[in-house]
């Protein structure tokens, strides 16, 4: 590798990874509540370990959801259906500890500061202030057709394929837990030129040999997913590099909601504000504003106003308007960043109520995001992945 080239690595995990089990359970509960009560306030956390699921958090709703039933159904869909896996949908214990949302927080969210002080009408802001303070990032770049960085894009596709070959009985000896990792080499112009390394670790039946796993994973998982032109004789493969991965899932490691925030976003290629997504309704700006920031960044790149774009939004609890908007195009912008911020303010309502309305976030759409990434998805219709504002942004930014 020449001195002007660099390597960058991102990872993903399968739906059977312990932390991802928790994300999916939390978002399944959120979706079940939103089906019946779109205005519910939900902050749902899940923890799993051998034979045990604990669901806790703060939920304010007018409806009833059978949480243990939802938990078991989600675990069953993932594929933990036999006790010998160390975790089984039918026999695991499910404990719940749910409180209502704090009245102090609800006061700020129910009626935003601007409305309480009379500077904006309730109708205008739909009486929703930010559910917490914090900062959120969104990112897009033109490395892939989904406008995502190549390393995380490939890592997600490999993880999804790993689950597909298990569920479709192409490789029936695989079990639900698994991880993928892709290292991409970039040239001096910051363009991806080749794959330097691929790492795949997959849980498996104890009687399958390492040689068979390595051969099958390369044939049925890597080759159908990774573009042939990015592979060369120096590409390195690490398939189950420890030699054995039989004990996995919650039996191998305890899991928690919100512990895969880099997998959920951009694989470390862009910055992260620290807030997790799963189990949170859209009044939580950790989730909704991160989606809005991606929506903004993706439309800027789709409009060819920049090759890459990172958007930061920041909020104060109980205040509807973002306290700051920042845009970084890393020197690739066709318009100044000040101009881009002006155009963004004109075309995107970044108040929590505005985001919810703009992206229609009171729907049960969240479980499908809880594995294989919240961004760059073409297998599901996610409103923040649309590029419907690109043409208008370009027109305003460049005066076309």
Curated annotation (Swiss-Prot):
**What would be the name of the gene that encodes this protein?**
metK
Task: Cite the EC number.
Answer: 2.5.1.6
Q: Where does ATP bind?
A: 17, 177-179, 244-245, 253, 259-260, 276, 280
As for what it does, the entry says: Catalyzes the formation of S-adenosylmethionine (AdoMet) from methionine and ATP. The overall synthetic reaction is composed of two sequential steps, AdoMet formation and the subsequent tripolyphosphate hydrolysis which occurs prior to release of AdoMet from the enzyme.
Localization of this protein: Cytoplasm
Q: What is this protein called?
A: S-adenosylmethionine synthase
Recorded hits in SUPFAM superfamilies, A to Z, give: S-adenosylmethionine synthetase
Needed co-factor(s) = Mg(2+); K(+)
Tell me the residue numbers annotated for binding K(+).
45
Describe the family membership recorded for this protein in Swiss-Prot or TrEMBL. Belongs to the AdoMet synthase family.
Task: List every stretch annotated Flexible loop.
Answer: 101-111
Q: Which InterPro entries match?
A: ADOMET_SYNTHASE_CS, S-AdoMet_synt_C, S-AdoMet_synt_central, S-AdoMet_synt_N, S-AdoMet_synthetase, S-AdoMet_synthetase_sfam
Pfam families according to UniProt: S-AdoMet_synt_C, S-AdoMet_synt_M, S-AdoMet_synt_N
Q: Which residues of this UniProt protein bind L-methionine?
A: 58, 101, 253, 284
Cellular component aspect of the GO annotation: cytosol
Query: Which GO terms fall under biological process for this protein?
Result: one-carbon metabolic process; S-adenosylmethionine biosynthetic process
The UniProt entry, under CDD domains, shows: S-AdoMet_synt
Keyword Cell division tagged: no
What pathway does the annotation place this protein in? Answer: Amino-acid biosynthesis; S-adenosyl-L-methionine biosynthesis; S-adenosyl-L-methionine from L-methionine: step 1/1
Query: What coarse category fits the chief subcellular location reported for this protein?
Result: cytoplasm
Record keywords: ATP-binding, Cytoplasm, Magnesium, Metal-binding, Nucleotide-binding, One-carbon metabolism, Potassium, Transferase
Q: What do we know about how this protein assembles, alone or with others? A: Homotetramer; dimer of dimers.
